[in-house]
């Protein structure tokens, strides 16, 4: 059995970093948006754990809004990525329009859930 060393881990992180630096800027912006949405959901969960979740519908709506938006942004990233062969025929404008429309539907459902 081969033991992994810290050099292997450093090589892995170096190769991941060098591959990510080659990523186009528009995909990096989408990645930043996804990280922000997930971070916001984590802040809401931490707040709920510390303070409580008295209006549970509000807490649930906020977390589901953040996670749903992050999932839709990941779908946008998949569709906009030029190296993805499944969506070669899809224009980036169409993918962004789908993202906006799905976000609108998501937030209408969340507002309806709030009551």
UniProtKB/Swiss-Prot annotation:
It is found in: Endoplasmic reticulum membrane. It is a multi-pass membrane protein. It comes from the Eukaryota. GO terms for cellular component: oligosaccharyltransferase complex. Residues 53-55 are lumenal. Pathway: Protein modification; protein glycosylation. GO terms for biological process: protein glycosylation. Keywords: Apoptosis, Endoplasmic reticulum, Membrane, Transmembrane, Transmembrane helix. The chain crosses the membrane at residues 32-52, 56-76, 95-115. Residues 1-31, 77-94 are cytoplasmic. Belongs to the DAD/OST2 family. PANTHER family: DOLICHYL-DIPHOSPHOOLIGOSACCHARIDE--PROTEIN GLYCOSYLTRANSFERASE SUBUNIT DAD1. Subunit of the oligosaccharyl transferase (OST) complex that catalyzes the initial transfer of a defined glycan (Glc(3)Man(9)GlcNAc(2) in eukaryotes) from the lipid carrier dolichol-pyrophosphate to an asparagine residue within an Asn-X-Ser/Thr consensus motif in nascent polypeptide chains, the first step in protein N-glycosylation. N-glycosylation occurs cotranslationally and the complex associates with the Sec61 complex at the channel-forming translocon complex that mediates protein translocation across the endoplasmic reticulum (ER). All subunits are required for a maximal enzyme activity. Component of the oligosaccharyltransferase (OST) complex. This is Dolichyl-diphosphooligosaccharide--protein glycosyltransferase subunit DAD2. The lineage of its organism: Eukaryota, Viridiplantae, Streptophyta, Embryophyta, Tracheophyta.
